[in-house]
Design a protein with these regions (language model features):
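Bacterial N-terminal signal peptides that target proteins for export
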Residues: 3-15
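Bacterial N-terminal signal peptides
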Residues: 14-23
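Extended glycan-interaction surfaces of carbohydrate-active proteins
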Residues: 40-138, 162-181, 235-325, 365-443, ...
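Alpha-helical support elements that line or immediately flank enzyme active sites
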Residues: 140-170, 396-407, 448-461
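Aromatic/His-enriched, Gly/Pro-containing loop or helix-boundary segments
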Residues: 171-214
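Inter-helical turn/loop segments and adjacent helix faces that build the functional surface
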Residues: 201-212, 340-355, 458-461
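Long, repeat-rich segments with strong aromatic
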Residues: 320-347, 441-449, 454-458, 462
Length: 528
Protein backbone atom coordinates (compact mmCIF):
# COMPACT_ATOMS: atom_id res chain seq x y z
CA UNK A 1 0.00 0.00 0.00
CA UNK A 2 1.27 3.50 -0.78
CA UNK A 3 1.97 5.72 2.22
CA UNK A 4 1.91 9.49 2.64
CA UNK A 5 5.70 9.48 2.14
CA UNK A 6 5.15 8.68 -1.53
CA UNK A 7 3.02 11.77 -2.20
CA UNK A 8 5.87 14.24 -2.94
CA UNK A 9 7.44 11.75 -5.33
CA UNK A 10 4.12 11.17 -7.06
CA UNK A 11 3.51 14.91 -7.39
CA UNK A 12 6.95 15.37 -8.95
CA UNK A 13 6.26 12.44 -11.27
CA UNK A 14 2.98 14.01 -12.35
CA UNK A 15 4.61 17.41 -12.96
CA UNK A 16 7.39 15.77 -14.96
CA UNK A 17 4.78 13.88 -17.02
CA UNK A 18 2.99 17.14 -17.85
CA UNK A 19 6.23 18.83 -18.90
CA UNK A 20 7.21 15.81 -20.97
CA UNK A 21 3.78 15.80 -22.60
CA UNK A 22 4.16 19.43 -23.61
CA UNK A 23 7.57 18.74 -25.12
CA UNK A 24 6.42 15.62 -26.90
CA UNK A 25 3.33 17.26 -28.31
CA UNK A 26 5.24 20.10 -29.96
CA UNK A 27 5.83 18.20 -33.22
CA UNK A 28 2.40 16.55 -32.96
CA UNK A 29 0.22 19.62 -32.67
CA UNK A 30 -3.25 20.29 -33.98
CA UNK A 31 -1.96 21.51 -37.33
CA UNK A 32 -0.58 18.12 -38.33
CA UNK A 33 1.96 15.48 -37.46
CA UNK A 34 5.65 15.00 -38.02
CA UNK A 35 5.41 12.10 -40.44
CA UNK A 36 9.16 11.50 -40.49
CA UNK A 37 9.26 11.12 -36.72
CA UNK A 38 6.38 8.66 -36.80
CA UNK A 39 7.77 6.61 -39.68
CA UNK A 40 9.32 3.85 -37.50
CA UNK A 41 6.02 3.48 -35.66
CA UNK A 42 4.12 3.21 -38.93
CA UNK A 43 6.59 0.65 -40.28
CA UNK A 44 6.13 -1.44 -37.13
CA UNK A 45 2.36 -1.35 -37.60
CA UNK A 46 2.67 -2.24 -41.29
CA UNK A 47 4.88 -5.20 -40.43
CA UNK A 48 2.63 -6.31 -37.58
CA UNK A 49 -0.32 -7.16 -39.83
CA UNK A 50 1.57 -10.15 -41.19
CA UNK A 51 2.97 -11.07 -37.77
CA UNK A 52 -0.50 -11.04 -36.21
CA UNK A 53 -2.21 -12.90 -39.06
CA UNK A 54 -3.31 -16.49 -38.47
CA UNK A 55 -4.45 -18.80 -41.24
CA UNK A 56 -5.04 -22.47 -41.91
CA UNK A 57 -1.65 -22.58 -43.60
CA UNK A 58 -0.04 -21.89 -40.21
CA UNK A 59 -2.76 -23.46 -38.09
CA UNK A 60 -0.22 -24.78 -35.60
CA UNK A 61 0.42 -21.13 -34.65
CA UNK A 62 -3.30 -20.43 -34.26
CA UNK A 63 -4.20 -23.49 -32.17
CA UNK A 64 -2.12 -22.67 -29.04
CA UNK A 65 -4.13 -20.77 -26.43
CA UNK A 66 -2.16 -18.94 -23.71
CA UNK A 67 -5.36 -18.75 -21.67
CA UNK A 68 -5.94 -22.51 -21.37
CA UNK A 69 -3.55 -25.21 -20.11
CA UNK A 70 -2.65 -28.17 -22.31
CA UNK A 71 -0.78 -31.31 -21.37
CA UNK A 72 2.33 -32.06 -23.45
CA UNK A 73 1.64 -34.54 -26.21
CA UNK A 74 -2.11 -33.97 -26.30
CA UNK A 75 -3.52 -33.21 -29.76
CA UNK A 76 -4.65 -29.70 -30.55
CA UNK A 77 -8.44 -29.55 -30.76
CA UNK A 78 -10.08 -27.90 -33.76
CA UNK A 79 -13.87 -27.74 -33.73
CA UNK A 80 -16.07 -27.37 -36.80
CA UNK A 81 -19.76 -26.61 -37.19
CA UNK A 82 -22.18 -29.51 -37.86
CA UNK A 83 -23.04 -27.62 -41.06
CA UNK A 84 -19.44 -27.84 -42.22
CA UNK A 85 -18.00 -30.79 -44.15
CA UNK A 86 -15.47 -32.60 -42.01
CA UNK A 87 -13.99 -34.27 -45.08
CA UNK A 88 -13.57 -30.94 -46.86
CA UNK A 89 -11.84 -29.34 -43.87
CA UNK A 90 -9.64 -32.41 -43.33
CA UNK A 91 -8.56 -32.43 -46.98
CA UNK A 92 -7.96 -28.68 -47.04
CA UNK A 93 -5.79 -28.76 -43.93
CA UNK A 94 -3.85 -31.81 -45.11
CA UNK A 95 -2.99 -29.95 -48.33
CA UNK A 96 -1.94 -26.87 -46.38
CA UNK A 97 -0.07 -28.53 -43.51
CA UNK A 98 0.91 -32.01 -44.59
CA UNK A 99 0.02 -35.40 -43.14
CA UNK A 100 2.60 -35.28 -40.33
CA UNK A 101 1.27 -32.00 -38.94
CA UNK A 102 -2.28 -33.33 -39.08
CA UNK A 103 -1.30 -36.09 -36.65
CA UNK A 104 -1.02 -33.36 -34.01
CA UNK A 105 -4.53 -32.02 -34.68
CA UNK A 106 -7.87 -33.57 -33.76
CA UNK A 107 -10.92 -32.29 -35.64
CA UNK A 108 -14.18 -32.49 -33.71
CA UNK A 109 -17.72 -31.59 -34.70
CA UNK A 110 -19.48 -29.29 -32.24
CA UNK A 111 -22.10 -31.08 -30.12
CA UNK A 112 -25.72 -29.99 -30.20
CA UNK A 113 -25.31 -28.43 -26.76
CA UNK A 114 -22.22 -26.29 -27.26
CA UNK A 115 -22.42 -25.04 -23.68
CA UNK A 116 -21.62 -28.57 -22.44
CA UNK A 117 -18.11 -28.63 -23.94
CA UNK A 118 -15.42 -29.38 -21.37
CA UNK A 119 -12.40 -29.91 -23.63
CA UNK A 120 -11.97 -26.54 -25.28
CA UNK A 121 -10.33 -25.71 -28.57
CA UNK A 122 -10.14 -23.43 -31.59
CA UNK A 123 -13.16 -22.88 -33.83
CA UNK A 124 -12.48 -23.31 -37.53
CA UNK A 125 -12.58 -20.24 -39.77
CA UNK A 126 -12.05 -20.48 -43.53
CA UNK A 127 -10.09 -17.25 -44.10
CA UNK A 128 -6.96 -15.72 -42.57
CA UNK A 129 -7.55 -13.29 -39.72
CA UNK A 130 -5.61 -10.79 -37.63
CA UNK A 131 -5.38 -11.45 -33.88
CA UNK A 132 -4.89 -8.71 -31.27
CA UNK A 133 -1.64 -10.18 -29.91
CA UNK A 134 -0.22 -11.54 -26.65
CA UNK A 135 -2.64 -13.83 -24.82
CA UNK A 136 -5.29 -13.08 -27.43
CA UNK A 137 -4.40 -15.55 -30.18
CA UNK A 138 -7.80 -15.66 -31.91
CA UNK A 139 -10.15 -13.41 -33.91
CA UNK A 140 -12.06 -11.08 -31.61
CA UNK A 141 -15.38 -9.36 -32.13
CA UNK A 142 -14.96 -5.65 -31.57
CA UNK A 143 -11.16 -5.70 -31.81
CA UNK A 144 -11.58 -6.67 -35.44
CA UNK A 145 -13.34 -3.43 -36.39
CA UNK A 146 -10.42 -1.29 -35.23
CA UNK A 147 -7.98 -3.74 -36.79
CA UNK A 148 -9.87 -3.43 -40.07
CA UNK A 149 -9.69 0.36 -39.85
CA UNK A 150 -5.92 0.01 -39.73
CA UNK A 151 -5.82 -2.56 -42.51
CA UNK A 152 -7.77 -0.24 -44.79
CA UNK A 153 -5.53 2.69 -43.87
CA UNK A 154 -2.55 0.55 -44.86
CA UNK A 155 -4.13 -0.62 -48.12
CA UNK A 156 -4.57 -4.22 -46.89
CA UNK A 157 -7.88 -4.66 -48.72
CA UNK A 158 -7.72 -8.45 -49.14
CA UNK A 159 -6.87 -8.97 -45.48
CA UNK A 160 -9.73 -6.68 -44.45
CA UNK A 161 -12.14 -8.61 -46.65
CA UNK A 162 -11.02 -11.89 -45.09
CA UNK A 163 -11.94 -10.50 -41.67
CA UNK A 164 -15.48 -9.64 -42.77
CA UNK A 165 -15.90 -12.96 -44.55
CA UNK A 166 -14.96 -14.81 -41.37
CA UNK A 167 -17.61 -12.88 -39.44
CA UNK A 168 -20.23 -13.75 -42.04
CA UNK A 169 -19.13 -17.38 -41.68
CA UNK A 170 -19.42 -17.21 -37.89
CA UNK A 171 -23.00 -15.95 -38.11
CA UNK A 172 -24.00 -18.83 -40.38
CA UNK A 173 -22.07 -21.60 -38.61
CA UNK A 174 -21.87 -20.47 -34.98
CA UNK A 175 -25.03 -18.37 -34.71
CA UNK A 176 -23.46 -14.96 -34.15
CA UNK A 177 -20.22 -13.03 -34.28
CA UNK A 178 -18.40 -14.54 -31.34
CA UNK A 179 -16.42 -12.93 -28.56
CA UNK A 180 -13.64 -14.87 -30.33
CA UNK A 181 -13.22 -18.20 -32.12
CA UNK A 182 -12.64 -20.49 -29.13
CA UNK A 183 -15.27 -22.92 -27.88
CA UNK A 184 -15.55 -21.24 -24.46
CA UNK A 185 -16.72 -18.09 -26.28
CA UNK A 186 -19.68 -19.76 -28.02
CA UNK A 187 -22.12 -18.36 -25.45
CA UNK A 188 -21.49 -14.69 -26.18
CA UNK A 189 -20.72 -12.01 -28.72
CA UNK A 190 -19.06 -8.59 -28.36
CA UNK A 191 -20.01 -4.99 -29.24
CA UNK A 192 -21.45 -5.14 -32.79
CA UNK A 193 -19.52 -3.33 -35.52
CA UNK A 194 -20.42 -5.62 -38.45
CA UNK A 195 -22.22 -3.14 -40.69
CA UNK A 196 -19.47 -0.54 -40.18
CA UNK A 197 -16.95 -3.12 -41.35
CA UNK A 198 -19.10 -4.04 -44.35
CA UNK A 199 -19.70 -0.46 -45.48
CA UNK A 200 -16.13 0.72 -44.97
CA UNK A 201 -14.89 -2.24 -47.01
CA UNK A 202 -17.54 -1.65 -49.69
CA UNK A 203 -16.42 1.97 -49.99
CA UNK A 204 -13.01 0.64 -51.05
CA UNK A 205 -14.18 -2.12 -53.41
CA UNK A 206 -17.53 -1.00 -54.84
CA UNK A 207 -18.49 -4.69 -55.11
CA UNK A 208 -22.29 -4.50 -55.09
CA UNK A 209 -22.79 -8.25 -55.63
CA UNK A 210 -20.69 -8.91 -52.54
CA UNK A 211 -22.66 -6.28 -50.62
CA UNK A 212 -25.91 -8.01 -51.56
CA UNK A 213 -24.55 -11.26 -50.18
CA UNK A 214 -24.06 -9.76 -46.72
CA UNK A 215 -27.75 -8.93 -46.17
CA UNK A 216 -28.90 -12.29 -44.68
CA UNK A 217 -26.09 -12.20 -42.12
CA UNK A 218 -26.92 -8.61 -41.17
CA UNK A 219 -30.55 -9.57 -40.58
CA UNK A 220 -29.59 -12.58 -38.47
CA UNK A 221 -27.03 -10.70 -36.40
CA UNK A 222 -29.49 -7.88 -35.78
CA UNK A 223 -32.04 -10.39 -34.49
CA UNK A 224 -29.41 -11.78 -32.11
CA UNK A 225 -29.20 -8.38 -30.41
CA UNK A 226 -32.87 -7.42 -30.54
CA UNK A 227 -34.52 -10.62 -29.29
CA UNK A 228 -34.34 -12.50 -25.98
CA UNK A 229 -32.22 -12.54 -23.94
CA UNK A 230 -30.62 -9.34 -25.25
CA UNK A 231 -33.69 -7.18 -25.72
CA UNK A 232 -35.54 -5.45 -22.90
CA UNK A 233 -39.09 -5.58 -24.33
CA UNK A 234 -40.82 -3.00 -22.17
CA UNK A 235 -37.98 -0.54 -22.70
CA UNK A 236 -37.19 -0.94 -26.40
CA UNK A 237 -33.44 -1.10 -25.85
CA UNK A 238 -30.90 -3.93 -25.67
CA UNK A 239 -28.42 -5.25 -23.12
CA UNK A 240 -25.43 -7.56 -22.89
CA UNK A 241 -26.34 -11.08 -21.75
CA UNK A 242 -24.19 -14.21 -21.97
CA UNK A 243 -26.13 -17.46 -22.53
CA UNK A 244 -23.66 -19.53 -20.50
CA UNK A 245 -23.70 -20.38 -16.80
CA UNK A 246 -21.08 -20.79 -14.11
CA UNK A 247 -17.50 -19.52 -14.06
CA UNK A 248 -15.97 -18.58 -17.42
CA UNK A 249 -13.42 -21.36 -18.15
CA UNK A 250 -10.72 -19.03 -19.46
CA UNK A 251 -10.98 -16.87 -16.33
CA UNK A 252 -10.55 -19.83 -13.98
CA UNK A 253 -7.56 -21.09 -15.97
CA UNK A 254 -5.73 -17.85 -16.65
CA UNK A 255 -6.73 -14.72 -14.76
CA UNK A 256 -4.61 -15.30 -11.65
CA UNK A 257 -2.58 -12.87 -9.60
CA UNK A 258 0.90 -13.36 -8.13
CA UNK A 259 -0.65 -15.24 -5.20
CA UNK A 260 -2.44 -17.67 -7.50
CA UNK A 261 -5.89 -16.22 -6.83
CA UNK A 262 -8.36 -16.17 -9.70
CA UNK A 263 -10.56 -13.20 -10.53
CA UNK A 264 -13.37 -15.01 -8.70
CA UNK A 265 -11.26 -15.45 -5.56
CA UNK A 266 -10.57 -11.72 -5.58
CA UNK A 267 -14.26 -10.99 -6.17
CA UNK A 268 -15.21 -12.95 -3.05
CA UNK A 269 -12.57 -11.09 -1.07
CA UNK A 270 -13.95 -7.80 -2.37
CA UNK A 271 -17.45 -8.64 -1.16
CA UNK A 272 -16.08 -9.73 2.23
CA UNK A 273 -14.23 -6.46 2.76
CA UNK A 274 -16.43 -3.83 1.08
CA UNK A 275 -19.93 -2.50 1.53
CA UNK A 276 -21.58 -2.60 -1.89
CA UNK A 277 -24.17 0.12 -2.42
CA UNK A 278 -24.41 0.08 -6.23
CA UNK A 279 -26.88 -2.82 -6.24
CA UNK A 280 -28.39 -5.52 -4.05
CA UNK A 281 -25.28 -7.48 -3.09
CA UNK A 282 -27.34 -10.55 -2.15
CA UNK A 283 -28.13 -11.07 -5.83
CA UNK A 284 -24.50 -11.83 -6.53
CA UNK A 285 -22.87 -12.92 -3.27
CA UNK A 286 -24.02 -15.27 -0.51
CA UNK A 287 -22.24 -13.78 2.50
CA UNK A 288 -23.28 -16.58 4.86
CA UNK A 289 -21.57 -19.23 2.75
CA UNK A 290 -18.97 -16.92 1.17
CA UNK A 291 -20.08 -17.96 -2.32
CA UNK A 292 -20.66 -16.16 -5.57
CA UNK A 293 -24.18 -16.82 -6.84
CA UNK A 294 -25.24 -18.18 -10.20
CA UNK A 295 -26.35 -14.66 -11.11
CA UNK A 296 -22.86 -13.37 -10.34
CA UNK A 297 -21.40 -15.68 -12.97
CA UNK A 298 -24.13 -14.68 -15.43
CA UNK A 299 -23.26 -11.03 -14.82
CA UNK A 300 -19.53 -11.70 -15.01
CA UNK A 301 -19.88 -13.47 -18.35
CA UNK A 302 -22.15 -10.71 -19.67
CA UNK A 303 -19.63 -8.10 -18.60
CA UNK A 304 -17.15 -9.92 -20.84
CA UNK A 305 -19.60 -9.75 -23.74
CA UNK A 306 -19.65 -5.98 -23.24
CA UNK A 307 -15.89 -5.85 -23.83
CA UNK A 308 -15.40 -3.73 -20.70
CA UNK A 309 -13.97 -6.41 -18.46
CA UNK A 310 -13.68 -5.35 -15.77
CA UNK A 311 -14.77 -1.86 -14.70
CA UNK A 312 -17.06 -0.34 -12.09
CA UNK A 313 -19.20 1.21 -14.79
CA UNK A 314 -22.14 -1.06 -13.89
CA UNK A 315 -21.33 -1.14 -10.19
CA UNK A 316 -18.77 -3.13 -8.24
CA UNK A 317 -17.14 -5.81 -10.43
CA UNK A 318 -19.47 -4.81 -13.31
CA UNK A 319 -21.74 -7.82 -12.73
CA UNK A 320 -24.93 -5.75 -12.63
CA UNK A 321 -24.48 -5.16 -16.38
CA UNK A 322 -27.39 -7.56 -17.01
CA UNK A 323 -29.74 -4.92 -15.59
CA UNK A 324 -28.54 -2.11 -17.86
CA UNK A 325 -29.22 -0.86 -21.36
CA UNK A 326 -25.70 0.44 -22.15
CA UNK A 327 -25.27 3.59 -24.20
CA UNK A 328 -22.46 1.99 -26.26
CA UNK A 329 -24.45 -1.10 -27.28
CA UNK A 330 -27.57 0.82 -28.20
CA UNK A 331 -25.55 3.39 -30.13
CA UNK A 332 -23.96 0.54 -32.09
CA UNK A 333 -27.39 -0.94 -32.80
CA UNK A 334 -28.50 2.48 -34.06
CA UNK A 335 -25.44 2.48 -36.31
CA UNK A 336 -26.37 -1.01 -37.52
CA UNK A 337 -29.90 0.15 -38.35
CA UNK A 338 -28.68 3.29 -40.09
CA UNK A 339 -25.97 1.39 -41.98
CA UNK A 340 -28.47 -1.27 -43.05
CA UNK A 341 -30.71 1.48 -44.44
CA UNK A 342 -27.79 2.82 -46.46
CA UNK A 343 -26.95 -0.67 -47.70
CA UNK A 344 -30.53 -1.28 -48.81
CA UNK A 345 -30.61 2.12 -50.54
CA UNK A 346 -27.42 1.16 -52.38
CA UNK A 347 -29.02 -2.13 -53.42
CA UNK A 348 -32.18 -0.37 -54.62
CA UNK A 349 -34.56 -1.77 -51.99
CA UNK A 350 -36.28 1.42 -50.82
CA UNK A 351 -38.92 -0.41 -48.79
CA UNK A 352 -36.35 -2.26 -46.68
CA UNK A 353 -34.29 0.92 -46.36
CA UNK A 354 -37.32 2.78 -45.03
CA UNK A 355 -38.00 0.07 -42.42
CA UNK A 356 -34.38 0.17 -41.22
CA UNK A 357 -34.45 3.96 -41.08
CA UNK A 358 -37.57 3.90 -38.94
CA UNK A 359 -35.88 1.52 -36.50
CA UNK A 360 -32.88 3.83 -36.33
CA UNK A 361 -35.04 6.89 -35.69
CA UNK A 362 -36.89 5.12 -32.91
CA UNK A 363 -33.68 4.02 -31.20
CA UNK A 364 -32.13 7.46 -31.58
CA UNK A 365 -35.14 8.99 -29.83
CA UNK A 366 -34.95 6.42 -27.02
CA UNK A 367 -31.24 7.07 -26.49
CA UNK A 368 -31.76 10.83 -26.36
CA UNK A 369 -34.80 10.47 -24.10
CA UNK A 370 -33.61 7.79 -21.69
CA UNK A 371 -29.81 8.03 -21.69
CA UNK A 372 -29.19 11.77 -21.86
CA UNK A 373 -28.69 13.67 -18.60
CA UNK A 374 -29.46 17.32 -19.25
CA UNK A 375 -28.08 18.47 -15.93
CA UNK A 376 -24.75 16.68 -16.32
CA UNK A 377 -24.45 17.17 -20.07
CA UNK A 378 -23.43 13.54 -20.60
CA UNK A 379 -24.88 10.26 -21.84
CA UNK A 380 -25.17 7.50 -19.23
CA UNK A 381 -26.23 3.85 -19.07
CA UNK A 382 -29.88 3.17 -18.20
CA UNK A 383 -30.79 0.77 -15.37
CA UNK A 384 -33.83 -1.18 -16.59
CA UNK A 385 -34.76 -2.32 -13.06
CA UNK A 386 -34.70 1.03 -11.29
CA UNK A 387 -35.60 3.04 -14.42
CA UNK A 388 -32.78 5.43 -13.57
CA UNK A 389 -29.49 6.50 -15.10
CA UNK A 390 -26.26 5.39 -13.48
CA UNK A 391 -24.32 8.64 -13.28
CA UNK A 392 -20.90 7.13 -13.73
CA UNK A 393 -18.75 9.30 -16.00
CA UNK A 394 -17.45 6.98 -18.71
CA UNK A 395 -15.90 7.53 -22.14
CA UNK A 396 -18.79 5.75 -23.87
CA UNK A 397 -20.57 9.10 -23.53
CA UNK A 398 -18.82 9.95 -26.83
CA UNK A 399 -20.44 7.08 -28.75
CA UNK A 400 -23.60 9.09 -29.57
CA UNK A 401 -21.38 11.84 -31.02
CA UNK A 402 -19.45 9.34 -33.13
CA UNK A 403 -22.76 7.98 -34.46
CA UNK A 404 -24.39 11.37 -35.04
CA UNK A 405 -27.18 10.73 -32.52
CA UNK A 406 -26.56 13.83 -30.42
CA UNK A 407 -28.05 17.20 -31.32
CA UNK A 408 -25.54 20.04 -31.82
CA UNK A 409 -26.50 21.35 -28.37
CA UNK A 410 -25.99 17.96 -26.73
CA UNK A 411 -22.65 17.50 -28.49
CA UNK A 412 -21.53 20.90 -27.23
CA UNK A 413 -22.43 19.92 -23.66
CA UNK A 414 -20.45 16.67 -23.95
CA UNK A 415 -17.54 18.61 -25.39
CA UNK A 416 -17.69 21.06 -22.48
CA UNK A 417 -17.19 18.08 -20.16
CA UNK A 418 -14.06 16.94 -21.98
CA UNK A 419 -11.97 18.37 -19.14
CA UNK A 420 -13.31 15.60 -16.88
CA UNK A 421 -11.75 12.95 -19.12
CA UNK A 422 -8.74 14.62 -20.69
CA UNK A 423 -5.33 13.65 -19.33
CA UNK A 424 -1.72 14.28 -20.45
CA UNK A 425 -1.79 11.10 -22.56
CA UNK A 426 -5.30 11.29 -23.98
CA UNK A 427 -8.79 10.30 -22.87
CA UNK A 428 -9.42 8.59 -19.55
CA UNK A 429 -11.75 5.60 -19.72
CA UNK A 430 -13.64 6.88 -16.68
CA UNK A 431 -13.13 9.47 -13.98
CA UNK A 432 -12.87 6.87 -11.20
CA UNK A 433 -9.78 4.96 -10.00
CA UNK A 434 -11.03 1.51 -9.00
CA UNK A 435 -8.22 -0.95 -9.69
CA UNK A 436 -10.04 -2.06 -12.86
CA UNK A 437 -8.36 -1.82 -16.24
CA UNK A 438 -11.44 -0.18 -17.80
CA UNK A 439 -11.38 2.81 -15.45
CA UNK A 440 -8.97 5.64 -14.65
CA UNK A 441 -6.07 6.13 -15.01
CA UNK A 442 -6.12 3.94 -18.10
CA UNK A 443 -6.82 4.87 -21.69
CA UNK A 444 -7.66 2.55 -24.57
CA UNK A 445 -7.11 3.21 -28.26
CA UNK A 446 -10.67 2.38 -29.44
CA UNK A 447 -12.19 4.91 -27.05
CA UNK A 448 -9.69 7.56 -28.18
CA UNK A 449 -10.71 6.98 -31.78
CA UNK A 450 -14.45 7.02 -31.05
CA UNK A 451 -14.18 10.23 -29.01
CA UNK A 452 -11.89 12.02 -31.45
CA UNK A 453 -14.07 11.20 -34.45
CA UNK A 454 -17.18 12.11 -32.49
CA UNK A 455 -15.78 15.52 -31.60
CA UNK A 456 -14.60 16.05 -35.16
CA UNK A 457 -18.05 15.17 -36.52
CA UNK A 458 -19.58 18.12 -34.65
CA UNK A 459 -16.89 20.60 -35.63
CA UNK A 460 -14.75 20.50 -32.47
CA UNK A 461 -11.64 20.10 -34.58
CA UNK A 462 -9.13 21.65 -32.20
CA UNK A 463 -10.29 19.43 -29.34
CA UNK A 464 -10.19 16.36 -31.58
CA UNK A 465 -6.70 17.12 -32.85
CA UNK A 466 -5.38 17.90 -29.38
CA UNK A 467 -6.76 14.66 -27.94
CA UNK A 468 -5.48 12.63 -30.89
CA UNK A 469 -2.04 14.22 -30.67
CA UNK A 470 -1.77 13.42 -26.97
CA UNK A 471 -2.50 9.74 -27.44
CA UNK A 472 -0.35 9.35 -30.56
CA UNK A 473 2.51 11.07 -28.71
CA UNK A 474 2.11 8.64 -25.80
CA UNK A 475 2.10 5.57 -28.05
CA UNK A 476 5.06 6.97 -30.00
CA UNK A 477 7.03 7.69 -26.81
CA UNK A 478 6.47 4.20 -25.43
CA UNK A 479 7.29 2.67 -28.81
CA UNK A 480 10.57 4.60 -28.92
CA UNK A 481 11.43 3.36 -25.42
CA UNK A 482 10.29 -0.26 -25.66
CA UNK A 483 9.94 -1.07 -29.36
CA UNK A 484 6.37 -2.31 -29.02
CA UNK A 485 2.75 -1.17 -29.16
CA UNK A 486 0.50 -2.44 -26.39
CA UNK A 487 -3.13 -2.96 -25.46
CA UNK A 488 -3.65 -0.12 -22.98
CA UNK A 489 -1.84 2.84 -21.43
CA UNK A 490 -1.82 4.87 -18.25
CA UNK A 491 -2.79 8.22 -19.76
CA UNK A 492 -2.19 10.16 -16.54
CA UNK A 493 1.43 9.08 -16.07
CA UNK A 494 1.94 8.58 -19.82
CA UNK A 495 3.39 5.08 -19.71
CA UNK A 496 2.59 1.49 -20.63
CA UNK A 497 3.68 -0.12 -17.35
CA UNK A 498 0.23 -0.64 -15.83
CA UNK A 499 0.44 -3.92 -13.91
CA UNK A 500 0.88 -2.52 -10.40
CA UNK A 501 -2.37 -0.55 -10.51
CA UNK A 502 -4.67 -3.29 -11.87
CA UNK A 503 -6.38 -5.34 -9.16
CA UNK A 504 -8.99 -7.31 -11.12
CA UNK A 505 -8.85 -9.36 -14.31
CA UNK A 506 -5.40 -9.77 -15.87
CA UNK A 507 -2.78 -7.15 -15.03
CA UNK A 508 -0.15 -7.73 -17.72
CA UNK A 509 -0.11 -5.46 -20.75
CA UNK A 510 -0.37 -7.28 -24.07
CA UNK A 511 1.98 -6.65 -26.99
CA UNK A 512 0.88 -6.35 -30.59
CA UNK A 513 -1.48 -4.77 -30.51
CA UNK A 514 -4.18 -4.99 -33.13
CA UNK A 515 -6.71 -2.36 -32.17
CA UNK A 516 -4.09 0.11 -30.94
CA UNK A 517 -2.35 -0.19 -34.31
CA UNK A 518 -5.56 0.49 -36.21
CA UNK A 519 -6.78 3.35 -34.02
CA UNK A 520 -3.39 5.08 -34.07
CA UNK A 521 -3.32 5.02 -37.87
CA UNK A 522 -6.80 6.54 -37.90
CA UNK A 523 -5.83 9.25 -35.40
CA UNK A 524 -2.74 10.15 -37.42
CA UNK A 525 -4.76 10.35 -40.64
CA UNK A 526 -7.34 12.59 -38.99
CA UNK A 527 -4.71 15.12 -37.93
CA UNK A 528 -3.25 15.58 -41.42
Amino acid sequence: MRTDQTKPRRILTAVFALLLAAATLAPLGSQGVDQARLQPLREYIKMSWSTLTRSNRDLLQALPDPKMPRKPGEPWLLYISPQESRTRVQDELTRELGADAMKRIEIRVLPRDVLSIREHGLLYLPRPYVVPGGRFNEMYGWDSYFIQVGLLRDGEIARARDMVENFLYEIVHYGTILNANRTYYLSRSQPPFLTRMILELYERTGDKAWLQGTVPAIDRYYRFWTTAPHDVPDVGLSRYFDRGTGPAPEVVADEKDERGRTHYDRAREYYRTHDVTDYDEALYYDSRRDRLTDLFYKGDRSMRESGFDPSSRFGALNVDVIHYAPVCLNTLLYVMEDDAARIMDTLGDSSAARAWRQRAASRRDLINTMMWDEQAGLYYDYNVRTRQLRRYDFATTYFPLWAGIASPAQAARVRDNLKRFEAPGGLLTSTEVTGNQWDAPFGWAPLQMIAVNGLRRYGFTDDANRLAAKFVALVSKEFDEHGTIVEKYDVRRRESDVAADIKFGYSANQIGFGWTNGAVLDLIAGMK
